[in-house]
Swiss-Prot record:
Subunit organization: Homodimer. Interacts with TNFRSF1B/TNFR2 (activated) and TRAF2.
Reactions the enzyme catalyzes: Release of any N-terminal amino acid, including proline, that is linked to proline, even from a dipeptide or tripeptide
Location(s) in or outside the cell: Mitochondrion; Cytoplasm
Protein name, per record: Xaa-Pro aminopeptidase 3
SMART domains hit by this protein: AMP_N
Region (Interaction with TNFRSF1B): 54-79
The protein's required cofactors: Mn(2+)
The UniProt record lists the keyword Chaperone: no
Length: 506
């Protein structure tokens, strides 16, 4: 899924990251944690799957599929280590991190959207109920990163649970997530006087609160009260995103699963695209194949763009017929166990590339393969983007689409590919959006590589045979110390492979 070339938030973020110089080692350092006390999970349905009620999804000790209480505790520990580093030189002897969950959002009266947890909240505790608060509080007499983790959760309510399903309650929240304590949500107000103290530095994202009501009830008054103190409320989001950049082995395994099942869904969708075909049918086929293989939801509304519509980068209407002889560009991904995939393929719906289609497709494929070889430690997405533009300028000249100097070819490349080469990937499609693309890549980072060439049918500068063609090829890549690990490697992209799949009989 494409993202914009730049964002105005980068300058302050880069400044903050300079203050964290050396903190990448914090992410890779070995930590010694006290064993997480094992607490018996209630033998009842909670507000989310548990090892007791869903043993086919979770093993004992896991909070979410594949991710244990120990992993979540380590994340909180690392976050408090970053808080400790950034707080040096500031007054305040106590530190409290506050992270809000998402609320339920409604599409119309009494009709909710499918609930999706705030990913920063989810990353730190794995709790998947709305209207909750996570608090990480430094321990008196102990140095950070020692802390106490607390959840404030909705109280169990038989009346509401009759309609909305079970809630975990405080006992379920503690046993499932492994936090130290849990309290009913309304008791958070009793913590506020301590947070207002001059000696307490509060870390909370007051500029973009994830839960408007909880912010208004609790955190906005606190933020305003501390605005004139020496210890103003400080943002924690950039620290959380700094952690989320580097995926653990368990996270990479979840992303491998998402990549594999999405690749299989692409294969089945390619096979089903017999011309003429409705974009809506391919949308439905792709979603079905993802869900049938275990995906929770699609990661985003997919682009299913036939013919000239592939030149609309975020085309999501998906309601037109794709004619015989046209290609379809499908940009789609799924979410599986909190982690997402993001893959794009372009293919002819009748199963055979025309000569101009194959010519343009092979050019994009060659650029994409060259960019994949650059996905190694020390380079950056910006470096790869610059290389993509250089290669694309040359390819556009080779194809006869442009006839200009080297400098003009670089400019033309931006015309025919107006988006970046990729973005970070993880729990979000456009993961860790405050992290600049100029950061050196490190082992454990996951990125997309997605060059494309788009030639609208009204572009009279291009040869007529290419007009109306749009091609993008996107893979998901784990940066390793050795060669890149392609999470979407099972998704065909060679011309011969695509044509064989589209022409198979069963």
């Amino acid at each position: 899924m494409l993202s914009l070339l730049s964002t105005p938030r980068l300058v302050p973020v880069i400044a903050r990251l300079r203050g964290l110089s050396g903190c990448m080692s914090c992410l890779q350092r070995r930590y010694s944690l006290q064993p997480v006390p094992v607490k018996e999970i209630p033998n009842r349905y909670l507000g989310q799957p548990s090892p007791v009620t869903h043993p086919h999804l979770l093993r004992p000790g896991e909070v979410t599929p594949g991710l244990s209480q120990v992993e979540y505790a380590l994340r909180r520990h690392k976050l408090m280590a970053l808080v400790h580093k950034e707080a040096q030189g500031h007054s305040g002897t106590d530190h409290t991190v506050v992270v809000l969950s998402n609320p339920i959002h409604y599409m119309s009266n009494d009709i909710p959207y499918t609930f999706h947890q705030d990913n920063s909240f989810l990353y730190l505790c794995g709790f998947q109920e709305p209207d909750s608060i996570l608090v990480l509080q430094s321990c008196s007499g102990k140095q950070l990163p020692s802390h106490k983790a607390m959840l404030f959760v909705p109280r169990r309510d038989p009346g509401r649970e009759l309609w909305d399903g079970p809630r975990s309650g405080t006992d379920g929240a503690i046993a499932l997530t492994g936090v130290d304590d849990a309290y009913p949500l309304e008791e958070f107000q009793h913590l506020l006087p301590k947070l207002r103290a001059e000696t307490n530095m509060v870390w909370y994202d007051w500029m973009k609160p994830s839960h408007a009501q909880l912010h208004s009830d609790y955190m906005q008054p606190l933020t305003e009260a501390k605005a004139t103190s020496k210890n103003k409320v400080r943002s924690v989001q950039h620290l959380i995103q700094h952690l989320r950049l580097i995926k653990s082995p368990a996270e990479i395994k979840r992303m491998q699963i998402a990549g594999k099942l999405t690749s299989e869904a692409f294969i089945e969708t390619m096979f089903a695209s017999k011309a003429p075909v409705d974009e809506a049918f391919l949308y439905a086929k792709f979603e079905f194949e993802c869900r049938a293989r275990g995906a929770d939801i699609l990661a985003y509304p997919p682009v299913v763009a036939g013919g000239n519509r592939s030149n609309t980068l975020h085309y999501v209407k998906n309601n037109q017929l794709i004619k015989d002889g046209e290609m379809v560009l499908l940009d789609g991904g799924c979410e599986s166990s909190c982690y997402v995939s993001d893959i794009t393929r372009t293919w002819p719906v009748n199963g055979r590339f025309t000569a101009p289609q194959a010519e343009l497709y092979e050019a994009v494929l060659e650029i994409q393969k060259a960019c994949l070889t650059l996905c190694s430690p020390g380079t950056s997405l910006e470096n790869i983007y610059s290389m993509m533009l250089t290669l694309m300028g040359q390819k556009l000249k080779d194809l006869g689409i442009i006839k200009t100097s080297k400098e003009s070819a670089f400019k033309a490349a931006r015309k025919y590919c107006p988006h970046h080469v990729g973005h970070y990937l993880g729990m979000d499609v456009h993961d860790t959006p405050d992290m600049p693309r100029s950061l050196p890549l490190q082992p454990g980072m996951v990125i997309t590589v997605e060059p494309g060439i788009y030639i609208p049918e009204g572009d009279t500068d291009a040869p007529e045979k290419f007009r109306g063609l749009g091609v993008r090829i996107e893979d998901d890549v784990v940066v390793t110390q050795d060669s890149p690990l392609i999470l979407s490697a099972d998704c065909p992209k060679e011309v011969n492979d695509i044509e064989q799949i589209c022409s198979r009989t069963s």
